A protein has these predicted regions:
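Conserved Nudix-box catalytic region and its N-terminal flanking loop in Nudix hydrolases
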Residues: 61-109
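Short glycine-rich loop/turn motifs
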Residues: 64-66, 140-142, 160
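Short amphipathic beta-strand and strand-loop transition segments with alternating hydrophobic
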Residues: 12-23
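Nudix hydrolase/Nudix homology domain
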Residues: 5, 16-17, 84-89, 95, ...
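Active-site segment of metal-dependent pyrophosphate-handling enzymes
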Residues: 70-72, 81-83, 91, 112, ...
Length: 196
């Protein structure tokens, strides 16, 4: 397929209306009405962490981050109970950027709150990407850090987290048997193969 055909198909999908249908404490539900490539209307549902005042606001704001932390030759993974799936999964340290907080402040706060660890060095910060593109406009950054310190629990009563550092061999075994969030799984995969 040549580029001009691809471009015409992309341009033929047009968002014509957005309506908020629910305003929850943490999530806002919206119905988007599109005109599809056949010229028919298609209603699509999304959730957003941010208030969207118009179509132009969709996917514009970075709401949080995920932290890929290492200590020497070990990767930080969290065993975390996630209410959305009603089970414990392996996850990265992650969280939402608070009002008035910089990305670097959020990195340090979230790592400390969820693990008790400190940021020794920020290695890299990737540009924000969509966290769940099929259902949400939420954008988060993936951050790579070196962490140090002792594990401590500073989480709220509504969180259950066990943090630990894992070797490449341990991570390889977890990838065969444990359930992961998608971002944690891809970070773990590359770490276990020596790419990270």
């Amino acid at each position: 397929m040549n580029c001009s055909i691809k471009a015409r198909r992309r341009m033929s999908m047009k968002l014509i209306k957005m309506e908020k249908v629910k305003d929850g404490k943490y999530l806002k539900n919206y119905e988007l009405t599109y005109r599809n490539k056949a010229g028919k209307e298609k209603t699509y549902e999304i959730v957003s962490r941010k208030e969207l005042s118009g179509i132009e606001d969709i996917g514009q704001k970075v709401s949080g981050l995920s932290i890929a932390a290492v200590n020497g030759d070990k990767l930080l993974l969290l065993r975390e109970f996630r209410m959305g799936v009603n089970k414990i999964v392996y996850n990265l340290c992650a969280g939402m950027i608070e009002e008035g907080e910089s990305l670097e402040q959020c990195i340090r706060r979230e790592l400390y709150e969820e693990t008790g660890l400190q940021v020794k060095r920020i290695i890299d910060i990737l540009p924000a990407s969509y966290a769940a593109v099929a259902i949400s406009d939420t954008k988060t950054s993936i951050v790579f850090v070196e962490a140090e310190g002792e594990f401590e629990d500073h989480t709220s009563d509504n969180e259950w987290i066990e943090a630990g550092f894992y070797t490449k061999e341990e991570v390889r075994e977890l990838l065969k048997t444990a359930e992961f969030s998608s971002r944690a799984q891809i970070i773990a995969y590359f770490f276990a193969r020596g790419v990270l």
